[in-house]
């Protein structure tokens, strides 16, 4: 997916603004230590590092292009994600650890860009699809969104979450667990105001879990 618009930009994880191009999220080059420690390494890769597998895509650039098309307002994406993480790893209580925590690193990235955001798009939940974490997921999400709105000083901040997709080559327990997370996500709007949930269950996969690049474009436009 190519972004031809200079009005859609991204603040990449190596702390530079540039026209948004996938992959906009690249933890190996991140300056925040939490991102390399989660990968088990001691420092970031050079800024020009490329995934040797040539993979990496998300709905962010497609989403921003669609927002620009609909509103005419230039879009800026502040990239903070790290794949395969749990809500416990995003615990707002860890913000005191600054760039050594996912939540703290996210806050610092926003602060470096004026401290204000117009909203958040969120794609997480697969790593919490386990019997021991499913019972905690709803309350963890409620606390997370509440903390975000408090720390960004934006009580009504729009929060758009992706409902996790399906998975293949799995056992009955895993399928049940993913279904439980999807159902919690579907009903979160009853507990969190100004939260929207976007489905992904009907989109094609690139492997047993991950959406294809084509699906990410469709998802972003939704």
Regions found by a protein language model. Give the residues of each.
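Cell-envelope and extracellular/periplasmic
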Residues: 1-222
């Amino acid at each position: 997916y190519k972004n031809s618009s200079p009005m859609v930009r991204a603040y990449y994880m190596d702390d530079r603004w540039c026209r948004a191009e996938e992959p906009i999220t690249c933890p190996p080059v991140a300056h925040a230590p939490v991102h390399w420690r989660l990968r088990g390494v001691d420092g970031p890769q050079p800024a020009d590092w490329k995934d040797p597998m040539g993979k990496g895509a998300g709905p962010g650039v497609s989403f921003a292009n669609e927002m620009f098309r609909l509103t005419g307002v230039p879009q800026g994406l502040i990239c903070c994600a790290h794949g395969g993480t749990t809500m416990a790893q995003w615990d707002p209580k860890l913000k005191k650890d600054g760039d050594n925590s996912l939540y703290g690193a996210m806050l610092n990235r926003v602060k470096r860009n004026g401290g204000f955001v117009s909203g958040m798009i969120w794609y997480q939940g697969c790593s919490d699809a386990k019997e021991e974490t499913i019972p905690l997921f709803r309350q963890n999400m409620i606390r997370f969104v509440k903390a975000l709105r408090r720390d960004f000083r934006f009580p009504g901040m729009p929060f758009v979450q992706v409902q996790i997709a399906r998975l293949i080559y799995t056992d009955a327990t895993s399928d049940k667990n993913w279904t439980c997370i999807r159902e919690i996500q579907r009903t979160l709007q009853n507990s969190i105001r100004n939260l929207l949930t976007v489905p992904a269950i009907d989109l094609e996969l690139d492997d047993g879990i991950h959406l294809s690049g084509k699906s990410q474009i469709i998802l972003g436009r939704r």
